[in-house]
């Protein structure tokens, strides 16, 4: 008689770590968490530190922290000085040489927040991929989240990489982002860019689709509860439908003459529209990084310059852009010591 004794399979450190990372807990960690949690913590902490204590006097010549009197809307972590170029501004690098105060003065916190923020967003997308795989569903949430990542990377990293330095990226603050939008309009005529138009159509179109879809579902809920509040009649595990797709189809068929008859196609469309808007606007920002122009109607500009009585909304916008450039550049880039002669300042077509 032969007795076979099985040997327990060898478990290496990788298997032990894999089990610990994927353990069922209140906040799932996962392999993506190794990237997500440290980078998100450092990015948020860097932003809170910068907006609370760090001045922008040495980079932009302005106050930008709560300590200097700013509020939540005007505080920001400002971009590094123009002279820093595209340096990563490492704390131990040749610029700061390990001096934390000097590092903050040069704008090192902005580079710190931007890079850690980008990796945190990527980690969050990978987290959605990882959990979708473990749960056994498709990864469309992660694919959709690539839209915000594309916008962040193109605006905060790709655009300044195409310009002379990190200085021209947006600073991390509410009013700072508004200033950046004015800059994009004045120097790139961004609102007339077709990629911006597609981005606006995607974002506002997505909001419209979301509102229409939510209202339609609420309109066609089945009266399947005895309570005054219809929300209490829903159970997450119920097998039957909670609203009538047929009734919704009849409603919109009467309104537009056409309506979605397939829930899968409807929800894919709701995914596609805003994500494509984010992607196309990101492509447009990369075009701005390369200083590509779009929709420059030079013939109208020439005619407006020659004929004081000829003016279009386009030529009026061009004059507004010239004003933005003329008055924004000296204030925004004081280190350049811009001086504009009186004759080049915009005064309107008739003068």
Swiss-Prot record:
Q: Where does Fe cation bind?
A: 213, 267
The alphabetized UniProt keywords are: Chlorophyll, Chromophore, Electron transport, Iron, Magnesium, Membrane, Metal-binding, Oxidoreductase, Photosynthesis, Photosystem II, Thylakoid, Transmembrane, Transmembrane helix, Transport
Q: Mind listing the GO biological process terms from this record?
A: photosynthetic electron transport in photosystem II
Q: How is the cofactor bound?
A: The D1/D2 heterodimer binds P680, chlorophylls that are the primary electron donor of PSII, and subsequent electron acceptors. It shares a non-heme iron and each subunit binds pheophytin, quinone, additional chlorophylls, carotenoids and lipids. There is also a Cl(-1) ion associated with D1 and D2, which is required for oxygen evolution. The PSII complex binds additional chlorophylls, carotenoids and specific lipids.
**Residue positions binding a plastoquinone:** 213, 260
Q: What is its EC number?
A: 1.10.3.9
Entry binding sites for chlorophyll a PD2: 196
Q: One Pfam family for this entry, by name?
A: Photo_RC
Q: Which of this chain's residues are annotated to bind chlorophyll a ChlzD2?
A: 116
Positions of transmembrane segments:
39-59, 123-139, 151-164, 206-226, 277-293
How does the protein's chain sit in the membrane according to the entry?
Multi-pass membrane protein
Q: Which residues bind pheophytin a?
A: 128, 141
**Catalysed transformations (reactions):** 2 a plastoquinone + 4 hnu + 2 H2O = 2 a plastoquinol + O2
Task: Identify the GO cellular component terms for this protein.
Answer: photosystem II; plasma membrane-derived thylakoid membrane
Name the InterPro entries on file.
D1/D2, Photo_II_D1/D2_sf, Photo_RC_L/M, Photo_RC_L/M_CS, PSII_PsbD/D2
Tell me more from the record.
2 of the reaction center chlorophylls (ChlD1 and ChlD2) are entirely coordinated by water.
Quaternary state and interactors: PSII is composed of 1 copy each of membrane proteins PsbA, PsbB, PsbC, PsbD, PsbE, PsbF, PsbH, PsbI, PsbJ, PsbK, PsbL, PsbM, PsbT, PsbX, PsbY, PsbZ, Psb30/Ycf12, peripheral proteins PsbO, CyanoQ (PsbQ), PsbU, PsbV and a large number of cofactors. It forms dimeric complexes.
Q: What does this protein do?
A: Photosystem II (PSII) is a light-driven water:plastoquinone oxidoreductase that uses light energy to abstract electrons from H(2)O, generating O(2) and a proton gradient subsequently used for ATP formation. It consists of a core antenna complex that captures photons, and an electron transfer chain that converts photonic excitation into a charge separation. The D1/D2 (PsbA/PsbD) reaction center heterodimer binds P680, the primary electron donor of PSII as well as several subsequent electron acceptors. D2 is needed for assembly of a stable PSII complex.
What family is this?
Belongs to the reaction center PufL/M/PsbA/D family.
Q: What is this protein called?
A: Photosystem II D2 protein
What is the protein's species of origin? Synechococcus sp. (strain WH7803)
């Amino acid at each position: 008689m032969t007795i076979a004794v099985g040997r327990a399979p060898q478990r290496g450190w990788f298997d032990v770590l894999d089990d610990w990372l994927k353990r069922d807990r209140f906040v799932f960690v996962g392999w993506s968490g190794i990237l997500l949690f440290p980078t998100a913590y450092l990015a948020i902490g860097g932003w809170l530190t910068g907006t609370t204590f760090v001045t922008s006097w040495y980079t932009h010549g302005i106050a930008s922290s709560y300590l200097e009197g700013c509020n939540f809307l005007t505080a920001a972590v400002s971009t590094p000085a123009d002279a820093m170029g595209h340096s990563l501004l490492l704390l131990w690098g040749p610029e700061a040489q390990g001096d934390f105060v000097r590092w903050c003065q040069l704008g090192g916190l902005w580079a710190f927040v931007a890079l850690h923020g980008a990796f945190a967003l990527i980690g969050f997308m990978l987290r959605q991929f990882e959990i979708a795989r473990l749960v056994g569903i498709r990864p469309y949430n992660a694919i959709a989240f690539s839209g915000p990542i594309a916008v962040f990377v193109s605006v905060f990293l790709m655009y300044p990489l195409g310009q002379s330095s990190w200085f021209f990226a947006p600073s991390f603050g509410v009013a700072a982002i508004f200033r950046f939008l004015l800059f994009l309009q004045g120097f790139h005529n961004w609102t007339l860019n077709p990629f911006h138009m597609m981005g606006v159509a995607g974002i506002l179109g997505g909001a419209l689709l979301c509102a229409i879809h939510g209202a339609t579902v609420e309109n066609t809920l089945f009266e399947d509860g005895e309570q005054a509040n219809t929300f209490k009649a829903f159970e997450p595990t119920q097998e039957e439908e909670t609203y009538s797709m047929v009734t919704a189809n009849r409603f919109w068929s009467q309104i537009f003459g056409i309506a979605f008859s397939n829930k899968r196609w409807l929800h894919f469309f709701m995914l596609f529209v805003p994500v494509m808007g984010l992607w196309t606007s990101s492509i447009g920002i990369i075009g701005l990084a390369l200083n590509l122009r779009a929709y420059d109607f030079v013939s109208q500009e020439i005619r407006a310059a020659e004929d004081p009585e000829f003016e279009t909304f386009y030529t009026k916008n061009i004059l507004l852009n010239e004003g933005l450039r003329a008055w924004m550049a000296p204030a925004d880039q004081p280190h350049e010591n811009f001086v504009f002669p009186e004759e080049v300042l915009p005064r309107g077509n008739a003068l």
